Amino acid sequence: MNQSRGIRQRPSGTGLDLQFRLVLLLVMLPQLFLLTLSLGSGWSFPGLLPDRIDFGPWRDLAIFSGLSSAALNGLLLSAATGLVSTTCGLMLSRCIRRMTGKLRRLGQAAVLFPFAISPAVAAVCLFDLSARIGLAGTFTGVLLCQSIFGSAAATVILLEGWGETAERREQLVRMLGGGTLDVWRHAIWPQVRGLLGICFLQSALFAWLDYGVVLHIGGGRVPTLTLRLFTLIRESSVNHAALATLLLLSPAMLALTILSIGGLFVTRRKALAMEQQR
């Protein structure tokens, strides 16, 4: 009996290219429609083009309007949230990993608690506390509240980086006379550096796209693109809302494009290596 019948054939390079282009087309079609709307003023359903092409929204963005200032403020907030969340997640995951027995299980369960409620509900519950300590309506208050969810996600991811290999490396460095800095440099950093980028990007994207926390804790005093987008929608400014949506989705789309191209490049290299082996 021919055993090759039970082996699934690997997709060819041409098939992978076709699939990638199809997925890319489906993803980019809504973005192209939003880009078209942002190039002009007015729009009537079911038309695909604005009433007139005058580049009004982009001119408003170029003169540093409220949209551009909200984008810059949101970018700063997301970067700060990613940095704080990744740092806290690294410390918390290390502490939980060094616990034993029921205490470790309790720590792992506590980390999952922020995922039990939505950020908007948590922001409503934390508003009174933030108002009492003077953080309501401030950049710092929004940052700390967003970091609760970002730190929880980073901790869950980084818990996978603390295994027996990391513990053995740490013991080896200490046996060779290394200090705390040497332990972090030679034992801990090589083990978790690949996860730190994932934690930072995930936390930063959460802060960039967040609406509930910024609305309730910020109280409208911390401008971000999400707040500006819903304001434009309520004001029926479809063209400016399309531009705000493009800016809001640009980091995620950029990351998706880079990952897709990188994955396709790796797949092609593997396919070429297999063909050379044959």
Stretches with model-predicted labels:
Residues 71, 96, 113, 160, ...:
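Short hydrophobic faces within alpha-helices
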Residues 19-21, 27-31, 141, 147-148, ...:
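Transmembrane alpha-helices
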Residues 1-36, 256:
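N-terminal signal-anchor/first transmembrane alpha helix
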Residues 2-13, 79-111, 124-128, 170, ...:
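Transmembrane-helix boundary motif in ABC transporter permease subunits
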Residues 72, 76, 102-108, 165-199:
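Amphipathic cytosolic juxtamembrane alpha-helices at the membrane-cytosol interface
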Residues 29-32, 36-39, 87-91, 124, ...:
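Membrane-embedded alpha-helices of multi-pass transport/permease systems
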Residues 2-13, 43-45, 58-66, 208-265, ...:
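Interhelical loop and adjacent transmembrane-helix boundary motif
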Residues 103, 120-151, 181, 217-220:
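Membrane-interfacial helix termini and adjacent extracytoplasmic/periplasmic loops
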